[in-house]
C-alpha cells in the first residue's frame, strides 16, 4: 500500500463502517433508512444473523444493484465466518457503485472482509483505493482515518512494521487538514502516541511503550478531546498485558469501553492468562456476538469463536 496523497474511525457502527455513510446523509437518518436496513439491524441485535441474511438476499432479488444491500449481505457473511462468499457481494457493490464515493465505501467493506481473516496485505490493498478517493476530494481527515483503519488491522494481525507505517501516514495526512484547529491536532498526536505505545509493547520494548503512554496522557490532560479518555485505560491495559502484568491489565481494561468487542476479547485473554477459564469464556461469548463490520469486530469475533471452541466449558 503506497501513500499517495493528492484509521479508528473509533466508532462502533451497527453492522458496517462502510455502509453507514450511505445511510447518514442528513440528521433525519433514522426516518430515511430503507426498511430492510432497519429490519436487518434489529435482527442482528437479536443475534439472528441467518434471518438478516435472508432479508438482505430477498432485497437483492428485487434490487440486485443496491449497494447498501450488497454491503449488508456481505457484512453478515463475514460475521458468520464466510469471507469468500461475503466478498462476492462486496465485489458486486464495487462493480455497480454509481459514484466514486459509493465505490470507495464498497472497497472499504471489502478491506474489512479481509480484516476478518487477519489478512493485512489484502486489507491494505483495498484501503489504498479508499485512501486515494479521499485524497482526490482533499478530505485529509478521512484519509487519516482510513490509514489508521488499515494500520489497526495490521497490528492486530501481527504485521507491526506495516502497522507502524500506516499509523504514521494517518498522523501525517490528518495534520494536512487546512486551517486545522488545535483540538484536531491533539487528536492526531494522541492517536499516534497511542499507536506507538501499542507497537512498542508488542515488540517487547516496555520502556518505549511507557514513554508513549505518558505522552498520550499528557495530551489527554489538555482536555481538548475528552471523548478520547476511554482509550487511555485501553492503552494502559494493552501495554500491561504484553508486559505480562495481567492483574494490572485486567484492572485497566475493566475501565475501558465494555461494549467494545476488542476490549471484551482482551479481558477474556487476560482472565485466561490468570487461570480463570470461566470468566474468560464469559467475555469471549460477549465478543463473539459483535455485529459491527470494523477492525475491533474483525479481530474479536473470529478469535472469540475459536477460544470458545477450544476452551473446556
List each language-model region with its residue ranges.
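Residue-level recognition of tetratricopeptide repeat
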Residues: 41, 75, 112, 152, ...
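Canonical tetratricopeptide repeat
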Residues: 72, 105-109, 142, 149, ...
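Register position in tetratricopeptide repeats
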Residues: 45-46, 79-80, 116, 149, ...
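Short coil turns that delineate tetratricopeptide repeat
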Residues: 30, 64, 98-101, 135, ...
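Alpha-helical segment of the N-proximal tetratricopeptide repeat
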Residues: 32-58, 62, 239
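Start-of-helix register in tetratricopeptide repeats
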Residues: 34, 68, 102-105, 145, ...
Amino acid at each position: 500500500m503506497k501513500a499517495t496523497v493528492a484509521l479508528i474511525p473509533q466508532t462502533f457502527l451497527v453492522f458496517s463502517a462502510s455502509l453507514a455513510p450511505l445511510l447518514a446523509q442528513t440528521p433525519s437518518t433514522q426516518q430515511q433508512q430503507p426498511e430492510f436496513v432497519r429490519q436487518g439491524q434489529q435482527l442482528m441485535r437479536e443475534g439472528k444473523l441467518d434471518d438478516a441474511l435472508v432479508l438482505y438476499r430477498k432485497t437483492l432479488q428485487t434490487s440486485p444493484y443496491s449497494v447498501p444491500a450488497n454491503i449488508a449481505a456481505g457484512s453478515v457473511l463475514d460475521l458468520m465466518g464466510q469471507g469468500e462468499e461475503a466478498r462476492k457481494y462486496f465485489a458486486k457493490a464495487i462493480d455497480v457503485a454509481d459514484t466514486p464515493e459509493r465505490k470507495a465505501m464498497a472497497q472499504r467493506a471489502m478491506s474489512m472482509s479481509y480484516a476478518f481473516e487477519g489478512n493485512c496485505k489484502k486489507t491494505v490493498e483495498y484501503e489504498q483505493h479508499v485512501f486515494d478517493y479521499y485524497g482526490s476530494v482533499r478530505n485529509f481527515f478521512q484519509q487519516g482515518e482510513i490509514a489508521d483503519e488499515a494500520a489497526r488491522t495490521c497490528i492486530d494481525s501481527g504485521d507491526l512494521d506495516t502497522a507502524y507505517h500506516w499509523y504514521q501516514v494517518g498522523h501525517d495526512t490528518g495534520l494536512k487538514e487546512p486551517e486545522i484547529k488545535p483540538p484536531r491536532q491533539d487528536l492526531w498526536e494522541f492517536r499516534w502516541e497511542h499507536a506507538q505505545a501499542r507497537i512498542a509493547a508488542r515488540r517487547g520494548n516496555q520502556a518505549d511503550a511507557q514513554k508513549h503512554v505518558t505522552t498520550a496522557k499528557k495530551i489527554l490532560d489538555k482536555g481538548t478531546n475528552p471523548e478520547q479518555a476511554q482509550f487511555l485505560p485501553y492503552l494502559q491495559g494493552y501495554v500491561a498485558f504484553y508486559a505480562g502484568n495481567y492483574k494490572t491489565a485486567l484492572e485497566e481494561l475493566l475501565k475501558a469501553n465494555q461494549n467494545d468487542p476488542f476490549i471484551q476479547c482482551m479481558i477474556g485473554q487476560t482472565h485466561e492468562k490468570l487461570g480463570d477459564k470461566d470468566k474468560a469464556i464469559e467475555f469471549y461469548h460477549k465478543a463473539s456476538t459483535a455485529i459491527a463490520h470494523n477492525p475491533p469486530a474483525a479481530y474479536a469475533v473470529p478469535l472469540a469463536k475459536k477460544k470458545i471452541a477450544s476452551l473446556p466449558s
